[in-house]
Each structure stands twice: as structure tokens, then as C-alpha cells.
């Protein structure tokens, strides 16, 4: 349609054909590997194409991550990861805190002895409170808090995302989801004045024409805290239970 061509021409003029916006929105490509790109497009593509045998992950602990929508255009996402494989990803819009909590509870009941991590910043605090009132063993995650490695990372969000980066590069099997893959390959990083790793803010991603990385954030939440090895069956190296 002519209107589509006009819109594409406007995007070309406003953002440029080499911009992340144009590559993701128009060409359906991952951004090129750049000096500020946290997770390479090639690592994401390989993880998307890989299929692990159940024996490679079914004895590993299960982690559930819930990123709660903050704005109308954002998604609430519940993602389930078992070791090196993503088991499921569900997205929702326009749910209140109680409804989100009920969805989390339903997913939790499906998986035995899973660890449940919920973003407790903003509206997420109500979800965490509701789950706690129902006696679910939820862990509220405030990504702005101090990380375990305070020398290397600016905050917990940077630490979570970097753990996820290392996981993505370790022979994993991620779900075949275009939006998740685009979000993983689009995030950028930098350094604080004290040389700590910082992850790009959602507001800065929007300035680049990209949407809030809600699905990737849900995956990152599963790396908020290392799951104790006593929750695993069999013998594994320390890196295996991230």
C-alpha cells in the first residue's frame, strides 16, 4: 500500500536503514554485533535452533520469572526455565495484580519445587504481596538493589542480565519466539564511572525505537539468585544450576 511505503520512507529518514529500529521493525533482523551489544545475534540464533534432549535438562532445577507490566503498551510475562532450556513463555495484557498473581500461582502448581521470582518494583509489589498472602514461596526481585558482585556490576539487574548472557552462550535451548529473540539481541550495556557493568535502561531502548524488553526481563529474573544445588538431582558443575 502507498501508506505503507510512505511510512517506510519516514522510518528510513528518521532512523536510517542501519538503525536498530529499522533492522528490528522492518527487516526482521537482529542488530549487528557492536561494541555495546550485550548478547550477540549469533548466540541467540544458535540457541533458538538448538534442541536439547530431555536428559540434558530434566534433572535441573526449575525457575519461574514474572515481569509485571508497568505501562499499557507493556506485557506481563511469565517464563519457565529448567537448566539450559526454556520450557514455556506466556504473555498477558491489562491484568490487575490479583489476576497476575493467580496466573503465577497456576504456573507454580504445574512445576514441582520451582523457584518463583517476581519483579517487585512498582505494580509488581502487589503481585508479590498477594502470592505471599496465599503462602506461595515467592521471591520478590528489585533489580535496582545491590548485586552479589558489587565490584563488577552496577546493580542486580546488570548481574542478572550478565548471567543470562553467559547462559545464552553456553549451549542452551530457547523457545522459538521472535519477540524474545529480538529483545535478547537488542539490549546494550555500558560502564559506570567506577567501571561497573550497567545495562541499558528501558527508557533508552524506547528512544532507539525499541519496545520494552519484557520477555527478556522475565528470563533475566530466573537468574536473580543462584538456585541451591540441593534442589537438583544428580551431580553437576556449579555453572549448571544457574
Task: Please state what every model-predicted region is.
Residues 67, 119, 214-217:
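Acidic active-site catalytic centers that drive phospho-/nucleotidyl reactions
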Amino acid at each position: 500500500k502507498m501508506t505503507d511505503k510512505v511510512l517506510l520512507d519516514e522510518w528510513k529518514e528518521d532512523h536510517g536503514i542501519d538503525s536498530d529500529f529499522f533492522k528490528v521493525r522492518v527487516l526482521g533482523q537482529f542488530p549487528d554485533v557492536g561494541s555495546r551489544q550485550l548478547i550477540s545475534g549469533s548466540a541467540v540464533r544458535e540457541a533458538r535452533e538448538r534442541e536439547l534432549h530431555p536428559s540434558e535438562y530434566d534433572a535441573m532445577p526449575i525457575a519461574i520469572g514474572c515481569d509485571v507490566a508497568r505501562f499499557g503498551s507493556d506485557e506481563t510475562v511469565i517464563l519457565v526455565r529448567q537448566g539450559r532450556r526454556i520450557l514455556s513463555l506466556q504473555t498477558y495484557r491489562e491484568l490487575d495484580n490479583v489476576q497476575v498473581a493467580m496466573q503465577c500461582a497456576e504456573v507454580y502448581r504445574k512445576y514441582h519445587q520451582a523457584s518463583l521470582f517476581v519483579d517487585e518494583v512498582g505494580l509488581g509489589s502487589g503481585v508479590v504481596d498477594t502470592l505471599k498472602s496465599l503462602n506461595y514461596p515467592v521471591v520478590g526481585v528489585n533489580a535496582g538493589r545491590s548485586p552479589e558482585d558489587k565490584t563488577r556490576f552496577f546493580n542486580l539487574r546488570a548481574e542478572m542480565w550478565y548471567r543470562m548472557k553467559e547462559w545464552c552462550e553456553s549451549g542452551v535451548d530457547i523457545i522459538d519466539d521472535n519477540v524474545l529473540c529480538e529483545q535478547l539481541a537488542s539490549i546494550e550495556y555500558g560502564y559506570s564511572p567506577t567501571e561497573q557493568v550497567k545495562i541499558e535502561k528501558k527508557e533508552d531502548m524506547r528512544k532507539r525505537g525499541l519496545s520494552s524488553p519484557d520477555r527478556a526481563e522475565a528470563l533475566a529474573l530466573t537468574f536473580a539468585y543462584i538456585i541451591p544445588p540441593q534442589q537438583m538431582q544428580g551431580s553437576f558443575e556449579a555453572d549448571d544450576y544457574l
